[in-house]
């Protein structure tokens, strides 16, 4: 059985995410998806619009996904080994970079193949976020995570 693994924030889930998951599932028997936890998103200098628990539930509901695990760090080799994955699916924007050439060698030593998928042209969570900021006048702190925290505070104060 071929176990595949891929990771992502999966914020503002869009057709590019769906295409990646569909294509990945077509190349493995079991697809495990690591959804990046909120703390790691912040560590990488960004903020998710949708909280981790909601993003994980959205990804879990996709028919191509067999399991969802939290991605707490960037160590994909350790994750693949722990999960028994022999294939890692990543976006082709990393293809050919020095960093990923080294990763390919390291993964190969562990018997893990890296398969690159093309990004869906013209769509990304970042582009959607920017469009929302422009068209709706949203600021950087306009996220459902903040709304959820505000609602929780309001319920506690009621």
Question: At which residue positions do the language-model features occur?
Answer:
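Nucleotidyltransferase catalytic core that binds NTPs
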Residues: 1-158
């Amino acid at each position: 059985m071929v176990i595949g693994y891929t990771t992502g924030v999966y914020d503002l889930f869009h057709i590019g995410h769906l295409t990646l998951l569909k294509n990945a599932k077509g190349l493995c028997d079991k697809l495990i998806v690591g959804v990046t936890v909120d703390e790691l998103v912040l560590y990488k200098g960004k903020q998710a619009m949708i909280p981790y628990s909601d993003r994980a539930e959205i990804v879990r509901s996709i028919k191509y996904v067999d399991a969802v695990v939290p991605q707490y760090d960037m160590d994909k080799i350790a994750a693949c080994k722990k999960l028994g994955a022999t294939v890692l699916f990543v976006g082709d924007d990393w293809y050919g970079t020095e960093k990923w050439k080294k990763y390919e060698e390291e993964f190969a030593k562990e018997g893990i193949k890296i398969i690159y998928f093309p990004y869906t042209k013209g769509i990304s969570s970042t582009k959607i976020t920017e469009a929302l900021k422009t068209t709706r006048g949203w600021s950087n702190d306009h996220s459902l995570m903040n709304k959820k925290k505000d609602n929780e505070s309001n319920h506690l104060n009621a």
